[in-house]
C-alpha cells in the first residue's frame, strides 16, 4: 500500500491529539485509540501519581501482557482443534 493509500485520522488519547497513519480503516484505528485511552484512564485511576510517560509505558506493558495471554490461549485452542481433527 502506497503512502497515498493509507488512512489518516486524528485521535485523542489521554487528552492529547495524535495524527495516525495506517493501512486499517479509520473505524479500526479509532477503536484502537479509544481502547488505549480507556486503558490509560483505568491505570491512572489506580496510580494517580504517575506522569504521562510512565503511564504510557505501563499501559504498553499491560497491553502486551494481555496480547501474549490471548496469543497463548489461541495457540492452545488451535492445538485442541488439531487434536480433535486427528
From Swiss-Prot:
One of its GO terms (biological process) is FtsZ-dependent cytokinesis. GO terms for cellular component: cell division site; cell septum; cytosol; plasma membrane. It comes from the Bacteria. Pfam families: ZapA. It is found in: Cytoplasm. InterPro entries: Bac_CellDiv_Activator (IPR053712), Cell_div_ZapA-like (IPR007838), Cell_div_ZapA-like_sf (IPR036192), Cell_div_ZapA_firmicutes (IPR023688). Keywords: Cell cycle, Cell division, Cytoplasm, Septation. Homodimer. Interacts with FtsZ. Activator of cell division through the inhibition of FtsZ GTPase activity, therefore promoting FtsZ assembly into bundles of protofilaments necessary for the formation of the division Z ring. It is recruited early at mid-cell but it is not essential for cell division. Belongs to the ZapA family. Type 2 subfamily. This is Cell division protein ZapA. The lineage of its organism: Bacteria, Bacillati, Bacillota, Bacilli, Bacillales. The gene is zapA.
Amino acid at each position: 500500500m502506497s503512502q497515498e493509500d493509507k488512512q489518516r485520522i486524528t485521535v485523542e488519547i489521554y487528552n492529547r491529539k495524535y495524527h495516525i497513519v495506517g493501512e486499517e480503516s479509520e473505524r479500526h484505528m479509532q477503536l484502537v485509540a479509544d481502547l488505549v485511552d480507556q486503558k490509560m484512564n483505568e491505570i491512572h485511576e489506580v496510580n494517580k501519581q504517575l506522569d504521562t510517560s510512565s503511564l504510557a509505558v505501563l499501559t504498553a506493558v499491560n497491553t502486551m501482557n494481555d496480547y501474549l495471554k490471548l496469543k497463548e490461549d489461541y495457540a492452545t485452542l488451535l492445538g485442541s482443534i488439531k487434536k480433535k481433527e486427528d
